[in-house]
Amino acid sequence: MMTLRDLINKLLGRETSSANTARERLQLVLAHDRVDMSSLTTDLLDKMRKEILDVVAKYVEIDFDEVAVSLETEDRMTALVANLPIKRTISGEIKFKKADKANKDIKK
């Protein structure tokens, strides 16, 4: 898995040192070892999925029929992957601007 730092170094023609590569690999191993995957029960994953969807749905309209949330493990690293198809954005920004203006008027 290429990190952002690796990509930038590659684009700039820099080579990563073996020490940096070893350090990054060790950090991944330590992070993986700290996470007890057995503690991620189906109930906990369902709760996380619901909370993620609730937060994202505040800002965009989601196609809930096509939502996919999964755990993927690759190279000793586990990731929570959420595929959230967006139908359209919600114009919450206008509401915030109006609310901010109202709050400023009240303070005056």
From Swiss-Prot:
This is Cell division topological specificity factor. It comes from Prochlorococcus marinus (strain AS9601). Prevents the cell division inhibition by proteins MinC and MinD at internal division sites while permitting inhibition at polar sites. This ensures cell division at the proper site by restricting the formation of a division septum at the midpoint of the long axis of the cell. It holds the Pfam family MinE. The keyword Cell cycle applies. InterPro entries: MinE, MinE_sf. Belongs to the MinE family. GO terms for biological process: cell division; regulation of division septum assembly. Keywords: Cell cycle, Cell division. It comes from the Bacteria.
